[in-house]
């Protein structure tokens, strides 16, 4: 039973997490908020990373298309501790230009992982 579980986890990682040529995650932007920009002075630094994610799927016989999504990772540095928060939305569109525009809006407005879904719903 344990052996089958390990095989399933390996399959899951290979198929869904992006360890093959059909999946991709690329850093789009990285912003850093320093202590002067933060209202809560207990935090010394916040880093927000915006990723464009894509997955190739078969649309018709012999034809693959890319479906694009977005992932945001927020890292808060509290002294020597680091707190990480992450959220993603898969398969938003097949148009890479739309995803680039969405990522630009997210970066410009410094959207954190918790607000990702709301902002995407508002913009789309």
Each model region followed by its residue ranges:
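A short, structured beta-strand/loop element
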Residues: 62-84
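Gram-positive cell-envelope targeting signals
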Residues: 1-2, 19
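Compositionally biased, intrinsically disordered linkers/stalks adjacent to structured regions
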Residues: 9, 97-124
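Short, mixed charged/polar active-site loops
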Residues: 45-47, 80-87
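A short, exposed loop/beta-hairpin motif centered on an aromatic-Gly-Thr core
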Residues: 83-97
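Basic helix-extension-helix modules of the SAP/HeH family
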Residues: 52-54, 58-62, 78, 105-106
């Amino acid at each position: 039973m344990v052996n089958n579980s390990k095989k399933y986890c390996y399959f899951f990682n290979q198929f869904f997490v992006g360890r093959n040529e059909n999946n991709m995650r690329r850093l789009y932007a990285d912003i850093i908020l320093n202590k002067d920009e933060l209202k809560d002075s207990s935090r010394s630094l916040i880093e927000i990373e915006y990723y464009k994610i894509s997955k190739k799927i078969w649309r018709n016989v012999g034809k693959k298309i890319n479906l694009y999504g977005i992932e945001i990772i927020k890292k808060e540095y509290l002294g020597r501790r680091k707190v990480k928060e992450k959220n993603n939305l898969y398969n938003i569109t097949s148009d890479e230009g739309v995803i680039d525009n969405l990522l630009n809006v997210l970066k410009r407005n410094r959207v954190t992982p918790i607000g990702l879904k709301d902002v995407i719903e508002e913009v789309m």
